[in-house]
Amino acid sequence: MSIVRSDKPFVLAGRTYQSRLLVGTGKYRDMEETRLAIEASGAEIVTFAVRRTNLGQIEGEPNLLEVLSPDRYTFLPNTAGCYDAIEAVRTCRLARELLDGHNLVKLEVLADQKTLFPNVIETLKAAETLVKEGFDVMVYTSDDPIIARQLAEIGCIAVMPLAGLIGSGLGICNPYNLQIILEEAKIPVLVDAGVGTASDATIAMELGCDAVLMNSAIAHAQQPIMMAEAMNHAIVAGRLAYLAGRMPKKLYASASSPLDGLIK
């Protein structure tokens, strides 16, 4: 049975975005390369680690707010580097203070430094506290559909399952779990972590993900600005392919041209 998919706007915390690509600000050579790559990506949402980024609180060091304008981009402060719920909640409160009441945050609570897997127990605790405090929580999580469901029930505005380990570039390691999450989801689902090149981003979008967040895939490319542009196109292509619906796979060949009326 064929499924006709209609395009739905990408909405987060009541705001509609045209780009379905979210990008990070870390790992670039300098602030100028950061600025140029983000411009080339077409992204409207930019994430940064609160604990590692100068937003004006450190005098004499490069200030992200002087490179990327809050009038042009939506900032998504994240809790990278946090290993328990208390630390993550404290970091989100700091972000709110530094950004004058900004409520949109990306929650990530890590389990260990080797894998950077999410600690889902601490993530659930932190999410519950942050939602109660009025934060709009986008949450980095495992590809476990049950955990994704619980985070949505708590009140998170988006779930962000990893496709592969952070910074690994391994691509979409478990598309089947992502499919289950997508089938059940009542909030946006964004792939977070694992993307290594444009085809990975396209696959994520073809699965039906609402968006993709990446940093290393662009920043660690040999030519980051060119890769940022490639990712922009990949996201659009993947979304269109998802909406169009791919042809069914067949074991045997099927001729493209009709066989009747052949010239003899």
UniProtKB/Swiss-Prot annotation:
Q: What keywords does the record list, in alphabetical order? A: Cytoplasm, Schiff base, Thiamine biosynthesis, Transferase
Quickly give the catalysed reaction. Answer: [ThiS sulfur-carrier protein]-C-terminal-Gly-aminoethanethioate + 2-iminoacetate + 1-deoxy-D-xylulose 5-phosphate = [ThiS sulfur-carrier protein]-C-terminal Gly-Gly + 2-[(2R,5Z)-2-carboxy-4-methylthiazol-5(2H)-ylidene]ethyl phosphate + 2 H2O + H(+)
Q: State where it is primarily located.
A: cytoplasm
Q: Which PANTHER family match?
A: THIAZOLE SYNTHASE (PTHR34266:SF2)
Q: Which gene encodes it?
A: thiG
The family annotation for this protein states: Belongs to the ThiG family.
Pfam families under this entry? ThiG
Task: Give any GO molecular function from the UniProt entry.
Answer: thiazole synthase activity
Residues forming the catalytic site:
106
Supply the Gene3D superfamilies for this chain: Aldolase class I (3.20.20.70)
The protein, known as: Thiazole synthase
Where on this chain does 1-deoxy-D-xylulose 5-phosphate bind? 167, 193-194, 215-216
Domain of life where this protein originates: Bacteria
Which terms does the UniProt entry file under GO BP?
thiamine diphosphate biosynthetic process
